């Protein structure tokens, strides 16, 4: 997995001086305890940092400005232990540029029925202190995540942890660099888009490079490095018999190893974490990158085929949200319309990430009928089973829209022995018919990012952080209601 910065999250508790110094000491003690206990839980991918209790407008504004200035701070978690008059928060929230989570909890889980008195009531006021704070967020239109429940509840912790990963993806987005080798596939509409608009909206730097630059990087790779990488292939994957002995199949695999090493060197030199290729721009290359792309995706790089830079960036960011697990570039390829058992077979020409594999991948070499190059090596496998999401980011001209479909991946009943590509089979929610109708009405692309590890909630949170539209297709979706949602969204987003 590509390394990330040492991110952290600030835990800020609100109160006021009305209750006296002893009460504030208890608020601080409780807040420290919560932070320390949460940090002991391995579910959290990044540490929480306790910050002093804030009780005045000046303290609140200062902590928000400090969070903005910190390269390590990826987000702020707030909690009102007591009542904290929300007008005090206006100045700080106006300044805050980091993702914000409102943890609506309280220190004690249960009411102490036998001992409860007014001292306890005055100290433990989050039930209404957080509502006051929630009002000012709504009044100001602050983008924020609200998580409700006791801080020891595993579900609360899991939601907080997933939000952390999403906030880090947002932070990574602000300096994400995409390398485009060649242009978009000719005449294709959905892979186009406003690259300047994307940099303003998401922070992405998207630039094109001549295929000759990549070819030179590939030529610079040493034979020793290729041999070492081939040894690694033999440890990790099954290889067809012809690929284990000298000959054209072995040489095809060697060529993908060269491409992988040259491509990785180019990306590392330019600090790129996402890239695109296209089969129409391969001058000087012997093969379309296949195995090379699959392995780079497994390391955490984002990828988009046919010049699809939006999906490449989305794959990278969803890799961050997923901690590198179970996430891949994908394409809806063909349908199975058996009544009562409708499914979608997802694949691509070559480039499906092995992190979604259910079986040990196998390196094979087969002809590729487009691109006019030599037969490329690729990893072939069946995808895993379980709940997952498919996500597509599109450019509507005046805004970006993120479309998410919750799906259930299933084990194939047949081996598909003649299909020479990695593939995965899924049943979309609520059904193939309704999901496809809704997807098409929303303008969803044929390229997606598929993930077992990322949730629809995380993607909704990311859309909230970046200020874009998000629509979700799931088991509750009806096409008629979805049409109305799109109409309402059109009015809302055009009015912003």
Curated annotation (Swiss-Prot):
Keywords: Arabinose catabolism, Carbohydrate metabolism, Isomerase, Manganese, Metal-binding. Its cofactor is Mn(2+). Binds 1 Mn(2+) ion per subunit. It comes from the Bacteria. It catalyses: beta-L-arabinopyranose = L-ribulose. GO terms for cellular component: cytosol. It holds the Pfam family AraA_N. Pathway: Carbohydrate degradation; L-arabinose degradation via L-ribulose; D-xylulose 5-phosphate from L-arabinose (bacterial route): step 1/3. Mn(2+) binds at residues 306, 331, 348, 447. One of its GO terms (biological process) is L-arabinose catabolic process to xylulose 5-phosphate. Its EC number is 5.3.1.4. SUPFAM superfamilies: FucI/AraA C-terminal domain-like, FucI/AraA N-terminal and middle domains. GO terms for molecular function: L-arabinose isomerase activity; manganese ion binding. Belongs to the arabinose isomerase family. Catalyzes the conversion of L-arabinose to L-ribulose. This is L-arabinose isomerase. It comes from Geobacillus thermodenitrificans (strain NG80-2).
């Amino acid at each position: 997995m590509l390394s990330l910065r040492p991110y952290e999250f600030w835990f800020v508790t609100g109160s006021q001086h009305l209750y006296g110094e002893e009460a504030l000491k208890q608020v601080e003690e409780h807040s420290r305890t919560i932070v320390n206990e949460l940090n002991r839980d391995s579910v959290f991918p990044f540490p929480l940092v306790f910050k002093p209790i804030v009780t005045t407008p000046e303290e609140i504004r200062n902590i928000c400005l400090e969070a903005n200035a910190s390269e390590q701070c990826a987000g702020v978690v707030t909690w009102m232990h007591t009542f904290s008059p929300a007008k005090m928060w206006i100045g700080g929230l106006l300044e805050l540029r980091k993702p914000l989570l409102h943890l609506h909890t309280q220190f004690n889980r249960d009411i102490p029925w036998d001992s409860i008195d007014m001292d306890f009531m005055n100290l433990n006021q989050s039930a209404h202190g957080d509502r006051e704070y929630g009002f000012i967020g709504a009044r100001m239109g602050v983008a924020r995540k609200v998580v409700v429940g006791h801080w020891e509840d595993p579900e609360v912790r899991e939601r907080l942890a997933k939000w952390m990963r999403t906030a880090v993806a947002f932070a990574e987005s602000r300096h994400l660099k995409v390398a485009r080798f060649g242009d978009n596939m000719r005449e294709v509409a959905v892979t186009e888009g406003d690259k300047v608009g994307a940099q303003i909206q998401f922070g992405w730097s998207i630039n094109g490079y001549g295929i000759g630059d990549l070819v030179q990087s590939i030529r610079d790779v040493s034979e020793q490095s290729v041999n070492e990488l081939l040894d690694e292939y033999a440890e990790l994957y099954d290889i067809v018999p012809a690929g284990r002995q000298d000959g054209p199949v072995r040489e095809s695999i060697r060529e993908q190893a060269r491409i992988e090493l040259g491509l990785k060197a180019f990306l590392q030199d330019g600090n790129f974490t996402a890239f695109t290729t296209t089969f129409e721009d391969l001058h000087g290359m012997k093969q379309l990158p296949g195995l090379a792309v699959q392995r780079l995706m497994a390391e955490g790089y984002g990828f988009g085929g046919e010049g699809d830079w939006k999906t490449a960036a989305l794959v990278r960011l969803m890799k961050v949200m997923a901690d590198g697990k179970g996430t891949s570039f994908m394409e809806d390829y063909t349908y199975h319309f058996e009544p009562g058992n409708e499914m979608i077979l997802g694949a691509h020409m070559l480039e499906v990430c092995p992190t979604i594999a259910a079986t040990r991948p196998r390196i094979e070499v087969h002809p590729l009928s487009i691109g006019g190059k030599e037969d490329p090596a690729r990893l072939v496998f069946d995808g895993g089973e379980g709940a997952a999401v498919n996500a597509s980011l599109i450019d509507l001209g005046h805004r970006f829209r993120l479309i998410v479909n919750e799906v259930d991946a299933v084990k194939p009943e047949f081996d598909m022995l003649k299909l020479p590509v990695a593939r995965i089979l899924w049943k979309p929610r609520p059904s193939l018919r309704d999901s496809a109708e809704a997807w098409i009405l929303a303008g969803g692309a044929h390229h997606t990012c598929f993930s077992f590890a990322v949730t629809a909630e995380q993607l909704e949170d990311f859309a909230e952080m970046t200020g874009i539209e998000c629509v979700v297709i799931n088991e509750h979706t009806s096409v008629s209601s979805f049409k109305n949602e799109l109409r309402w969204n059109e009015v809302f987003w055009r009015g912003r």
